[in-house]
Amino acid sequence: MFITKNVYQSSGMRSTGLWGANIFLLIDNGVTLVDTGLRGRSANILNEVKRLGYKPSDVAYIIVTHHHSDHIGSLAELKNATGAKVMAHPADAPYIDGTLPQPGPARPRWLGKLLSPLSSMWSTVPAEVDKLLNDGDELPILGGIKILHTPGHTPGSISLLIPQEKLVIVGDLLAHRFRMRMPPGLFTVDVEQGVKSIKKLAGLDFNIIAFGHGAPIVNEAREAVAHFADKIESKAKGR
């Protein structure tokens, strides 16, 4: 579905019925992908590109919000199929290019055994990162995309502020399924840092917010984030 005239959101559903992350197609004289979903999604994503009237070679860039496998599972295949340049934050790049192994979640042993049958789905293939993105960088796409370093879920998590569209894409800084929430603590390296990143986000100017998981909020999104930031801060203080 189109969130704005130039930003398309594709759900992360696989044929198995299990959910991965949302994928975003930014349309501006070609296509920029934001995240790539679980492994095995590349054909579906390229079909979306074609359905919107573009060729695989029209995909110039792939921006990675963070290194988790439900966001980069199809990255290597899509990079090879399109020739796109991959961009990510320096703190997450070593996990994307295979310099460092993907860290497992902070989970009890029994949960690891429960998830082990899904290991092939959650696996990743290393992909070269062509450009490192730092806080405050601006990309010449859709009138200028501002890179926000929003760590917490991972050390190198980023969000994308697109003033022209009055939109911010936040990866897994927040999720929105029935209500706004933080991502699961089992898969978050620093919850306290994540709260700080949410407060940082609440101080910016946007009207629409799109998430790695869940439906976008398409009106008064900044106010919703500010309210949520106040709520979690109050909870942390025990009020």
Language-model region placement:
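Conserved beta-strand hairpin/beta-sheet module of binuclear metal-dependent hydrolase folds
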Residues: 1-52, 159-171
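Short Pro/Gly-enriched beta-strand edge/turn motifs at strand-loop
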Residues: 3-12, 116-121, 140-142
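Short, acidic/turn-prone active-site loops that include or flank metal/cofactor-
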Residues: 15, 91-93, 173-174
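Short glycine-/acidic-enriched loop or helix-start segments at secondary-structure transitions
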Residues: 19, 43-45, 73-75, 97-98, ...
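Residue-level marker for buried hydrophobic side chains located in beta-strands
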Residues: 32-34, 63, 86, 167-169, ...
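Metallo-beta-lactamase
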Residues: 38-40, 123-124, 128, 138-140, ...
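Active-site HxH/HxHxD metal-binding segment of metal-dependent hydrolases
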Residues: 40-42, 50-131, 234
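C-terminal regulatory/interaction regions
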Residues: 236-239
